[in-house]
Amino acid sequence: MAPKAEKKPAAKKPAEEEPAAEKAEKAPAGKKPKAEKRLPAGKGEKGSGEGKKAGRKKGKKSVETYKIYIFKVLKQVHPDIGISSKAMSIMNSFINDIFEKLAGESAKLARYNKKPTITSREIQTAVRLVLPGELAKHAVSEGTKAVTKFTSS
């Protein structure tokens, strides 16, 4: 039985090698067009470096968040209180939503007045339209104060 066991693996190895050889012949033919497509896009050695950088850029995709600023304001108002990551995410989404609404309203106002530029006046009017009552008044006063501080420095 031992000789038969030896013959079967020996018989299988050449059989496996032949399809592998056929696959090896077919695979390079299939890979050559792909390699040709990659070379013009990657441009040789520089392409491999760019591929790595592009990979890094995708990994380090910069996402603008307001988490730092939310945390700073929280510590100004309540120094002893923390915030969970879920609550922080909700606050970040809230701020993004408000800014989107303000930007959209400001753009509409600029279009209505046939002006190509959104100025502080459009922003101020958008704040009055989007935010309710006292909140709008406080936002306008804080915004005016911030703009004055920025222009004076």
From Swiss-Prot:
The modification N6-acetyllysine is found at residues 7, 37. Core component of nucleosome. Nucleosomes wrap and compact DNA into chromatin, limiting DNA accessibility to the cellular machineries which require DNA as a template. Histones thereby play a central role in transcription regulation, DNA repair, DNA replication and chromosomal stability. DNA accessibility is regulated via a complex set of post-translational modifications of histones, also called histone code, and nucleosome remodeling. Residues 1-28, 36-53 have a biased composition (Basic and acidic residues). This is Histone H2B.6. Belongs to the histone H2B family. CDD domains: HFD_H2B. Its main location: nucleus. Keywords: Acetylation, Chromosome, DNA-binding, Isopeptide bond, Nucleosome core, Nucleus, Ubl conjugation. Residues 1-60 are annotated as: Disordered. It comes from the Eukaryota. The nucleosome is a histone octamer containing two molecules each of H2A, H2B, H3 and H4 assembled in one H3-H4 heterotetramer and two H2A-H2B heterodimers. The octamer wraps approximately 147 bp of DNA. GO terms for cellular component: nucleosome; nucleus. PROSITE patterns: HISTONE_H2B. Can be acetylated to form H2BK6ac and H2BK33ac. It is found in: Nucleus; Chromosome. Gene3D superfamilies: Histone, subunit A (1.10.20.10). There is a cross-link at residue 149 (Glycyl lysine isopeptide (Lys-Gly) (interchain with G-Cter in ubiquitin)). GO terms for molecular function: DNA binding; protein heterodimerization activity; structural constituent of chromatin.
